Each structure stands twice: as structure tokens, then as C-alpha cells.
Amino acid sequence: MIRKIPSFIKIYESLIKIPTISSLNNKLDQSNKVLIDLLSNYFSELNFLINIKNIPNTNKFNMLASFGDGKGGILFSGHTDTVDFDEHLWTKDPFKLTEKNNKLYGLGTVDMKGFFAFILDALCSINIKSIKKPIYILATANEETDMSGARYFIQSSSIKPDFIIIGEPTSLKLVKAHKGHVSYSIDVVGNTGHSSNPANGINSIEIMHLVIKKLLKLKIYLREKYFHKDFSIGYPTMNFSSINGGNAINRICALCNLKFEIRPTPGLTLTQIEILIQEMLQAIFKKWPNRIFLKNLFFSVPPYEFPKEKKIIKKIENSCQLKPTTANYCTEAPFLGKIGPTLILGPGSIQQAHNADEYLDCSFIKPTKKIIRKLIKNFCY
């Protein structure tokens, strides 16, 4: 078979070379259009149909590459964006693929632009003209910020694959479920005054103390009520991330802020969390009206679990010779899972993601290509 696209390493180099940082800081945020166009060209050379869509009100794009007709098939998905990097911590060029000590260094090597190089290489090694079910490749935007790429895709697409593989770095473990993430900020507004007469003011730190006591009760309740046996940390976690208040030792504190996060297990919805927090703090809200303000900090991600009624997971396990596991981090699975049962499976370690000198250990290369080929041959032929 004549190869129509560059070698695996050359593709990898071309993907890492293009900066695609997603950030809530507009000065750092970058469009992914150049990378989307490059991927489109690669998949076009393999006779895939290309559909590029702009995410409304952004300079970001999704790409869906499709080959074959009919129902079902496989959707391989990855995000095109990376996090920002600290140039003082990196010892290598983040945008140049560097091979050293059996490792491939570069921003996005594991998280997760490199996954597209594996898909393209695998497709070059099999005769896809003989497939009986379609193959889809999805490249999304903004996974590292608000996951707007995945959220927009499920609103604008009508495909229904048999299952979806998200190629996030799982060390080639088959992840069937992961926790969600929701973060909050609470402001308590008091009245300042001289500390020599506390009765002349309202100390926001003292009210926040009551809030924290209630949240700690909620923490225990979540741990006891929503235990999930499949997770290494089998309960929803709550973390108090920061607390700030006061500006002088002799002044009654007028403003106190607390930031905290909850990572729910599957079975605990984001709506339930919101209701539980409101119920737990209701008495304090009533006692101190218009002084306690609760808000979400960032876009929330629900927990995800592969649907128990979908028996196809057993076939996937046997095909890959892998046993399913769980993860404590988040992916696009809760959103893509709305169009098809979703698993997370990809090369590299999550420990390298978001770190300086991010790298892919080359020991993952051969087994990853083998697994992708097996999935296509076992489920699309």
C-alpha cells in the first residue's frame, strides 16, 4: 500500500509544532484553526469526508472526519488544544518534538495532540476500503477550558457510533468511569469597625466559620451516601482551596472569601450538589440575609460512567485484552457520552499531562497502534 501521508514521527512533529493553547486569559488563548486544517488535509488524503465547524462566538473549530456509511461504527476523539506552559520550567522547546532517552518531548505529546498521529498511522496500515461500519475521527477545541468543543459537537451532530474512544493518556488502561468537577466561591460580607468594640460590626470570618462547619458536615454526608466501589478514592471529595479575609489586626473583618471544589462520583449529579449545598447553608442564609453569596467559579463537568446496560464493553475488553478501570480526573466523556457509550483509552501517562517537559514514553507506541488496528478490524469489518 502506498502511503499518502508523512511518517508517524513526521506527523507527530507537525502536530506539536503548531501552538494551540486554550486559556481563560484572552492574552494567552489561541485559535486551533491551523491545526484543524492540517488534520483535515491528512484525513482527506486518506479519502475521509471532512466537516469543519466553527464554535459560535469563538475562533475555535471542531473537525469530524468520516469514512464509510451505515449505522454504528467507532468514533475516535481527541482535543486539539493544550494548556499554557511556563518557559522557565521547560528545558526543551515545547513546540519542537524532541526524541531523547526513548521519550518524545513536547507540549501536547500525551495531552493530547499526539493521539492523532497514532490514528493516522494505524489507518495507513489497514485496508479501510473493506469496512462495513463507519470510522469517525473527532478533533475538538477548548477541552482545557470549558469543553465548548465537545458540547457544541453533540448539539450539531447526528451520528450515533456504537462506541467512542477518547485518546486521553491513560497508560493504555481502559477507563470506563471518572469523577466530575465543580468549584465554588463563597463571599461573606460583614460590617467593619474598630476591633475594640466587636458589637459595632459584623465579623465576616465568624460567619464563614459557620459556613465551613456546615460544608464539613456535607463532606461527611457525601462520603457516606455516594460511595462508589470501583474508584481508588471511592467517594466524592471536597477540598477547601483558599480562604481570604481581613486587612488589619485591629479592624473587624468585613469581607471573607472561600473557594472550594467537589469531585463527585457517578451517581451524584451537579444539580444534586447544588441542592445539597443550598439546603446545608439554608439556616445561615436565613440568619444573615444578603450577606452570603455563592457562585460557580468555572464550567462544571459531570461525572461519567459507561452505561451498565451496554454489553459491548465486554467485546472491547476482549479485543484490547484490557480490564476496565476508573479515573479521578475529568474528560469530555460526559458530553460525548450523549451520542454513544464512551471509553477513555490512550498512550502516555496522565502524570505527564500539564507538566513541564511533557513527554510520551516510546514504549507506548507499538501497543497503541496495535490496539487501534484491533478495534477497527473487530468492530468496523
From Swiss-Prot:
It is an enzyme of class 3 (hydrolase). The gene is argE. Pathway: Amino-acid biosynthesis; L-arginine biosynthesis; L-ornithine from N(2)-acetyl-L-ornithine (linear): step 1/1. It holds the Pfam family Peptidase_M20. GO terms for biological process: L-arginine biosynthetic process. GO terms for cellular component: cytoplasm. Keywords: Amino-acid biosynthesis, Arginine biosynthesis, Cobalt, Cytoplasm, Hydrolase, Metal-binding, Zinc. InterPro entries: AcOrn-deacetyl (IPR010169), ArgE/DapE_CS (IPR001261), Bact_exopeptidase_dim_dom (IPR036264), Peptidase_M20 (IPR002933), Peptidase_M20_dimer (IPR011650), Peptidase_M20A (IPR050072). This is Acetylornithine deacetylase. Belongs to the peptidase M20A family. ArgE subfamily.
